[in-house]
């Protein structure tokens, strides 16, 4: 008979954990910055956002509110409702429109976030995402699996010293309105 710990170990998917950990290692999980930093929004939603061009040639990112809710719940230990998740975006650069995104003559400019209620799309100006960062994730064989959690260290890429420890937890969150719940969520980011 399998022990509870063995069952949980079997439930882990390190490939899924790896996708999330690489994003969190770079951005952290301070969601309060979303209302002022569209580059953070672009980073968090990079796997879900669709790229299009505005009439003036500016690259726009579009994400459904359902996918956005899943991402917010993935990056936080708190369980967000749709309204709570959307309120994270509401700052001086946030605008809501009653129409579909495709029907609006208005499109966001740099640092603006537009929410189109007609088809529940969040649209913002894309930022170029790079692969050059001063931090890196510790090798997989050093990850610590503890029950339904995985503790992973983030290192300074040059000195290899530990910058932070991120704890990912199997996602057992219960919320309405998402599209596809992530395998893990970020339980904590502890900086050294």
Spans of model-derived segments:
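Core segments of small alpha/beta cavity-forming domains
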Residues: 7-119
């Amino acid at each position: 008979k399998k022990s509870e710990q063995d069952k949980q170990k079997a439930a882990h998917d390190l490939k899924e954990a790896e996708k999330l950990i690489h994003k969190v290692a770079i951005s952290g999980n301070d969601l309060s910055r979303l209302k002022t930093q569209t580059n953070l929004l672009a980073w968090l939603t990079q796997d879900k956002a669709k790229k299009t061009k505005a009439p003036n040639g500016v690259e726009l990112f579009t994400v459904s509110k359902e996918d956005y809710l899943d991402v917010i719940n993935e990056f936080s230990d708190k369980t967000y409702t749709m309204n709570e998740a959307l309120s994270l975006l509401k700052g001086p650069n946030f605008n809501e429109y009653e129409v579909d995104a495709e029907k609006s003559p208005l499109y966001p400019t740099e640092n603006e976030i537009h929410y189109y209620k007609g088809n529940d799309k969040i649209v913002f100006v894309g930022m170029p995402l790079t692969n050059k960062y001063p931090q890196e994730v510790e090798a997989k064989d050093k990850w610590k699996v503890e029950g339904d959690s995985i503790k992973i260290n983030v290192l300074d890429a040059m000195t290899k010293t530990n910058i932070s420890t991120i704890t990912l937890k199997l996602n057992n969150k219960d919320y309405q309105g998402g599209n596809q719940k992530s395998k893990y969520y970020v339980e904590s980011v502890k900086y050294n």
